[in-house]
Design a protein with these regions (language model features):
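N-terminal assembly/interaction segments in proteins that build large macromolecular machines
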Residues: 2-264
Length: 264
């Protein structure tokens, strides 16, 4: 059997980040050839990542960052809470937000090899669950909110108005989880399904058509729209008004938002 020195093991570990015994076994299998041993570790890492792919990643970290006129938000998932606090995991998550902030969501493809290697070293699935980047145009502001202490829910908002109000909106979105900014964004077929459900409720039977239509619209507003549409939701900072009313009061408007949540 080829004699493997401690310095060879250290060099391979420095190259690959592999655990000591894995590095030593790879060197033995490769007959002491560092490059071949590194390739063996890489192949084993790919196999390990493929085996773990698809495992649920309900822990992890959401990170948001704003730099001048652009901002980014990413959600990097792990299987367990301890890994979400692991220095290697956190270092990888920082690389993801750096890449997305500078180059956009497609930049995460350049980190795939590193992700695979990390999966092999840590021993559980790690995935970039979501990545988005916004550019603020004339008169627009960006704001973000990541909910402490777990940092598993985060929001990035692009709006017209003050940064302070935009941040309050981001906090609202984190808690209320709307899917659309305004009613105009809701697909017509989705509204039609909701109307159909309401029309079949027993308490509407026998009502005149105009009364029935009014009741359906009222229930849509208080139910479906208040749940799904940001501007229709009760403002968490003052439930006596809707988000839309709060925005109008300040001459503000939400242009876009993204919300990521790691459920667990």
């Amino acid at each position: 059997m080829t004699e493997i020195s401690a310095s060879q093991v250290k060099e391979l570990r420095d190259m690959t980040g592999a655990p000591m015994m894995d590095a030593k076994r790879a060197l033995v299998e490769a007959g002491g050839d560092l490059e071949k041993a590194a390739q063996l570790l890489r192949e084993k890492g790919l196999a390990a990542a493929a085996k773990r792919a698809g495992r649920s990643v309900t822990e992890g970290r959401v990170i948001a960052r704003i730099e001048n006129t652009h901002g980014a938000i990413v959600a990097v998932g792990s299987e367990t809470e301890p890994v979400s606090k692991n220095d290697e995991f956190l270092g990888f998550a920082e690389k993801v937000i750096d890449a997305v902030e500078k180059q956009g969501p497609d930049a995460i493809d350049s980190l795939e090899d590193e992700r695979v290697d990390l999966v092999a070293r840590i021993g559980e699935n790690i995935e970039v669950v979501g990545a988005s980047r916004f550019e603020a145009h004339d008169g627009e502001v960006l704001a973000s909110y990541v909910h402490p202490p777990a940092q598993k829910i985060g929001v990035l908002v692009r709006a017209q108005g003050s940064p302070d109000l935009a941040r309050l909106v981001a906090m609202h979105i984190a808690f209320a989880n709307p899917r659309f900014v305004t009613r105009e964004e809701v697909p017509e077929d989705e509204i039609a399904v909701e109307r159909d459900i309401l029309e079949k409720l027993p308490d509407l039977e026998g009502k005149p058509d105009d009364v029935k239509a009014k009741m359906i619209e009222g229930r849509l507003a208080k139910g479906f729209f208040a749940d799904s549409v940001l501007t229709d939701q009760p403002w968490i900072h003052n439930p006596d008004q809707t988000v839309g009313q709060a925005l109008a009061e300040h001459g503000a408007e939400v242009r876009d938002f993204v919300r990521y949540a790691l459920a667990g």
